[in-house]
Each structure stands twice: as C-alpha cells, then as structure tokens.
Amino acid sequence: MVDRFYEDKVLDFAMEFVVHKDHTVEFLGYSVFQTGESGAYGYNYVESQEELLRRIDVDAALLHRLIAYHKEHLAQTAYHGPVGIDMLKTADGSIHPCLEINFRMNMGILALLLHEQYGSGATVALTPVREHGFQALVEDGRLMILSEK
C-alpha cells in the first residue's frame, strides 16, 4: 500500500550539509532532483540556489526552521562528512521533512559543486563515475547518470 502522502508528490528536493569533526554543521544548499515512478533517481538540476528555491516554492521561514532542526540533530551524531536529507513536497504544499538521510557524498552535493564550477545550464560530461560502466552528464542544467549496460 502506498501512503497517500507520497501519491500527491509534486517535487523531490534535499538539503545538503557537511558535519565537521568538531560537530559543527554547515548547510551547503538545496538540491532538486527528479525520480521515476518507482522512486529511482533520475537527475539533479544544476542551478543557482535562487533558481532551486523558485522550484521548491515553499515558505522561506519553514525552510530555515528545517535547516536549524536538521543542523541541531546532525551535530549530535558521531558522524562527520557530507549528508543529504531527501524531502518531498505534495500537491497541497505540505513538506515531508525527512524521507531519507544519505550519510555520504551524493548527487545533490555533486550538483552544487558543478554549479559552482560551471554555472547554470552548462553541458559537461563526466566519465567514468564508477567502474561499472556508468557515465554522468550535465546537460541543459540537469545532472544525469547514464548506464552503458
């Protein structure tokens, strides 16, 4: 059975952080991504934070409260390194504030780094992403993973 909340999804997005060894937590930015019907990752948008916030289209005060909440809780962990917290927005504007926590380097952080390096809308091929025949391509402002299998 699929939770009704997920059936009404209109947007996948994430908050990207890094937890430092001294337990300080830095908010790196937002990422917006697409998934298929099965929920599998499709691609990230490589855009400015302003462009991503327009896509997210949620009250800024709510987003700031979520950032503070996640920073407070991440600071209490023994982990240090990159973290992405996946969220979703529903048709009525509700936010699911924590679908998944990725305690690792993730595609959202890579999209932030690519935007910093190349800007919005750049086309960049990155190969190989993995030893297993995958490629990454940034095209029309979207970060996509392509399988050669």
Residue ranges of each PLM-predicted region?
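Conserved metal-phosphate-binding beta-hairpin within the catalytic cores
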Residues: 74-107
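Sterically constrained small-residue positions within well-ordered secondary structures
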Residues: 6-8, 76-78, 136
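Phosphate-binding site of ATP-dependent enzymes
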Residues: 1-39, 88-97
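Short secondary-structure boundary micro-motifs
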Residues: 1-3, 69-73
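Peripheral (often C-terminal) accessory segments that flank ATP-dependent C-N-forming ligase machineries
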Residues: 120-149
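Short beta-strand element of the conserved SAM-dependent methyltransferase core
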Residues: 2, 87, 101, 144-149
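ATP-dependent carboxylate/phosphate-activation module, predominantly the ATP-grasp catalytic core
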Residues: 17-71, 78, 102-129
